[in-house]
Amino acid sequence: MGCVQSFRTLCDRPKNTNVRISLPAVCFVWQIAMIILFGVFIRYDEESDTHWIEHRKKENISSDIENDFYFRYPSFQDVHVMIFVGFGFLMTFLKRYSFGAVGFNFLIAAFGLQWALLMQGWFHSLDYTDGKIKIGVESLINADFCVAGCLIAYGAVLGKVSPVQLMVLTLFGITLFAVEEYIILSLIHARDAGGSMVIHTFGGYYGLSISWMLYRPNLDQSSNLQGSVYHSDVFAMIGTLFLWMFWPSFNSAITDHGDGQHRAAINTYLALASTVLTTVAISSLFQKHGKLDMVHIQNSTLAGGVAVGTAAEFMLMPYGSLIVGFCCGIISTLGYIYLTPFMEKHLKIQDTCGIHNLHAMPGVIGGIVGAITAAAASESVYGKEGLINTFDFEGAFKNMVPTKQGGHQAAGLCVAICFGIGGGIIVGCILRLPIWGDPADDNCFNDEPYWELPEDEESAPPILHYNNHMANKDVVDTNFGMEQN
């Protein structure tokens, strides 16, 4: 008990947001480390190396157009836009934290993708003949996926941490992601094309666990900056639209060429469309006078894309995709209305962006849908070759049957949750140390501590908020059941 009390006392020391030494030191040292590690380990793969001509002749490839670049790069472009524009602008809803939302998103994504190429390369792309990691366009897509988990986690602690803390969060998050991805995809042999388990479930619970460890009992001192204003919600909606439009590319980017990739895009497209309607319906039903809440429209409309990710390449059927989107729109929106305030009040989890409702819960639903769909697969639906190709029943897993594959899918979901929660608690303990330059409770959700602001912004008084992503609004009875004031 004495050690615990000493640790708490240490962590409760006065805050100092001056990162003039720590932030440049971390950026310079870690970037130099990346240069050295890339020099030692990273090389072009056979499709991006100058020996491609020889490889093409050896494999009897007739044209350069068959290079993987031309198959994957359109999807890579879409995923890249989602990472840097979609996630970045989605988090600009806070009235005084737009620089931090977009700028720090940019920072940790740029660092994270470099570290991800190394970590994922050591697990998946290491050539044991020369000890080098061979990278191509698919490696870039996987690195962006890896970064997405950390950006999801950032949403839980948005406005409450320093850029140095975010770099540490990303360093450990990428490392944990690479390990859990290897366990789920390679050892357990679960399929997760759109990352419902590997990306969203892990990233969601990783961020929530960190937020729980960094709980601020006096965060209400920054409540005047915790909401949005009209123009900040419009900017956040831009992020939503970019994510919504490109999510079919996200879920299909690394699936097998041909029918699997085609099917993944269709399933995601339909799930997203269905989610929009149910989100609007629930938002109107549970708000006073039937008005829509922009929080729900910005976030819950994307939940279907998250939940359909694992089963995106399976024979989910178009109506099945619509059902997944329908259910997720309801669950995610109700999560914002009831679950987020409950978690803050009773579980001490301050979830700034509501990632539990957009990523964690839909990710778990996606894992469950994937397990059920895999277990229900049959030769009559998939065909013999289709079943083998879709679930990769080859090599050590050639005797696998669909029902057993369903169990492996469920096991993969459990691993993602355990890594997210366990890793988040450990990293949260590290981030609680008073050496990272995080803001005081009365200075959160504010760009001023870390950014040079225009003079008119520095002197501007706080704007009264009209929309708060974390507010516990009063609930009153209506003819439909419950309604919010």
Curated annotation (Swiss-Prot):
Keywords: Ammonia transport, Cell membrane, Glycoprotein, Membrane, Transmembrane, Transmembrane helix, Transport. Functions as an ammonia transporter. May play a role in the elimination of ammonia in the gill. One of its GO terms (biological process) is ammonium homeostasis. This is Ammonium transporter Rh type C 1. It is a multi-pass membrane protein. Glycans are attached at residue 60. It comes from Takifugu rubripes (Japanese pufferfish). Specifically expressed in the gill by mitochondria-rich cells. The chain crosses the membrane at residues 21-41, 74-94, 99-119, 139-159, 168-188, 194-214, 234-254, 266-286, 300-320, 322-342, 358-378, 411-431. Residues 1-20, 95-98, 160-167, 215-233, 287-299, 343-357, 432-485 are cytoplasmic. The gene is rhcg1. It comes from the Eukaryota. Its main location: membrane. SUPFAM superfamilies: Ammonium transporter. Homotrimer. Belongs to the ammonium transporter (TC 2.A.49) family. Rh subfamily. InterPro entries: Ammonium/urea_transptr (IPR029020), NH4_transpt_AmtB-like_dom (IPR024041), RhesusRHD (IPR002229). GO terms for molecular function: ammonium channel activity. Residues 42-73, 120-138, 189-193, 255-265, 321, 379-410 are extracellular. It is found in: Apical cell membrane. GO terms for cellular component: apical plasma membrane.
